[in-house]
Amino acid sequence: MDGGQPVPSPLVPLGNGSDYSMSLEQKTTFVFVILLFIFLGILIVRCFRILLDPYRSMPTSTWADGLEGLEKGQFDHALA
């Protein structure tokens, strides 16, 4: 096609590979993406733990705590 010469690519540095170093913006972006992947992993693990055992994360109080002074079993009179 073009005489057998390689086509330059923006992803592959030309010349020696040891001359290529990441810029500050690329390093910052790389660290930010890694932190996002770590955060995503933590959220995935937390969601799977909630799906496997949903009642473990609930408080131990009962529904009757909100009746304010009424004993358990007397809710029929409170509704009337």
Curated annotation (Swiss-Prot):
It is found in: Membrane. The keyword Transmembrane helix applies. The chain crosses the membrane at residues 28-48. It comes from the Eukaryota. GO terms for cellular component: membrane. Keywords: Membrane, Transmembrane, Transmembrane helix. Its main location: membrane. Pfam families: Cortexin (PF11057). It is a single-pass membrane protein. PANTHER family: CORTEXIN-1-RELATED, CORTEXIN-3. Belongs to the cortexin family. This is Cortexin-3. It comes from Mus musculus. The lineage of its organism: Eukaryota, Metazoa, Chordata, Craniata, Vertebrata.
